[in-house]
Amino acid sequence: MEILSGAEMVIRSLINQGIQHIFGYPGGAVLDIYDALKTVGGVEHILVRHEQAATHMADGYARSTGKIGVVLVTSGPGATNAITGIATAYMDSIPMVVISGQVASSLIGYDAFQECDMIGISRPIVKHSFLVKRTEDIPIIFKKAFWLASTGRPGPVVIDLPKDILKKTNKYNFIWPKNIHIRSYNPTTKGHQGQIKKALRILLKAKKPIIYAGGGIISSNSSEELRIFAEKINCPVTTSLMGLGAFPGNHIQSISMLGMHGTYEANMAMHYSDVIFAIGVRFDDRTTNNLKKYCPNATILHVDIDPTSISKTVSADIPIVGDAKQVLKEMIELIKKEKQIHSLKEWWSSIGKWKKIKSLEYNKKSNKIKPQKIIQTLFKLTKGTSYITSDVGQHQMFTALYYQFNKPRRWINSGGLGTMGFGLPAALGVKLALPKATVICVTGDGSIQMNIQELSTARQYNLAVLILNLNNSSLGMVKQWQDMIYSGRHSHSYMDSLPDFVKLVESYGHIGLKVKTNEELEEKLILALKKLSEGNLVFLDIQIDDSEHVYPMQIQGGGMNEMWLRKKEVS
């Protein structure tokens, strides 16, 4: 039995949980932990340049691997700087444990230097939070925190550690618990047998069924089960933004992404379907448009591990609470007993007609560089094998629509909170987790400046990623909305004083390249990928057409079938 200080217990607990990397920034309240990182060893710490970036790095690490991302920050501003990243992970159901320092127990509530109520501030955006009151409780609290973060619907958990709990003079027996029990927490993983059978009967009788898959498929590692199930019933599959890669984008049954900027065929198929089999989704407002007009003839079958997500926005006719992987396995077994399954020939014919609209067409003859062309060229050169992170805005939507994701965990983006500044640190987290992977961050001139300081972190740890900056000298999505909804009044959506990104990147010790014409686009991309393969971080600053908009775009207040397409309204 080991006798350890609180700080040493923290490191030993991380090791026992199999944690190899943590992301953080030191400060007074956590200096004992930082000392233990040296004396105990066994965990690699990545020193970021801002605590928000630490959370995004841990987030990218978690999304690309399915492992838990771990963050270490000090009290006060260190903790509050992490809030945006915690909220980002919470909205997208990403497993994360955030260890925050706190002032000494005797000072809590007295407005001490760098004191803040991290438990209270984070409460709405975490699965759970712990304030450690006794040093000897550290092992069991850590085990509970990691269990909570990774089970049921995953999400972030905060552990707040007062400074006195960590002191070297405060030593206790380190007892690692074999088992834990958390009162009132027992996630349902096995779906109700009767509900599953009922849902399958309805789905097999449908004439216009559609499978709507989301990020829950990726979280539960059930992409293969989804593919097998979809093939057995020959049903079209659409995904949410978070679900891209859950079903192969190159599969004949894929009709791509639905929602505000989803494809014409996906949105039309949803609207005119008679049965929607929704699995691992929460019917976010960006995927439903006007709820009063939502899929008026569809019976809703909703599978989710989180019971609070079912019928929260769209009422489910057949609710199934359970793990997506287990439910799909059960359905696959039940289907084996079916003698005949509908061909859905007429339904596929309708979808084929919607596909002929070619909603993703754009002006390929333009003299200006089109963002669509950049993403398509990137896909061609990488053959779809890369891990792609993005920031938030037009470039995010262009990437989602024009880069074909055929495997899960290859698309890393802030879908729920929509956090600008996410892309670069997330890419660094992915690269740390998967050193041999090709990691590419697609960003814009607005987003990249939110956390551009992490180019320094990349240099310190030799994290080679490719950054594509789609530079239109404006906040593209804001400008698009101003064009389409605010009569073209561009209020504060232009970037008039951008830095010379190439020189800035070079000052951090990386390679910067500029692209101004269509003729040099592919050549520079090939060069950038070559330099990347040689172990360099490469920043490609691409001057794109600043008038380009993302289409399709659903009409506010309309049904799923009402959208703007190639600058004209269709329905």
Curated annotation (Swiss-Prot):
InterPro entries: Acetolactate_synth_lsu, AHAS_TPP, DHS-like_NAD/FAD-binding_dom, THDP-binding, Thiamin_PyroP_enz_cen_dom, Thiamin_PyroP_enz_TPP-bd_dom, TPP-bd_CS, TPP_enz. It catalyses: 2 pyruvate + H(+) = (2S)-2-acetolactate + CO2. It comes from the Bacteria. FAD binds at residues 153, 261-282, 304-323. PROSITE patterns: TPP_ENZYMES (PS00187). Pathway: Amino-acid biosynthesis; L-isoleucine biosynthesis; L-isoleucine from 2-oxobutanoate: step 1/4; Amino-acid biosynthesis; L-valine biosynthesis; L-valine from pyruvate: step 1/4. Belongs to the TPP enzyme family. Contains 1 molecule of FAD per monomer. The role of this cofactor is not clear considering that the reaction does not involve redox chemistry. This is Acetolactate synthase large subunit.
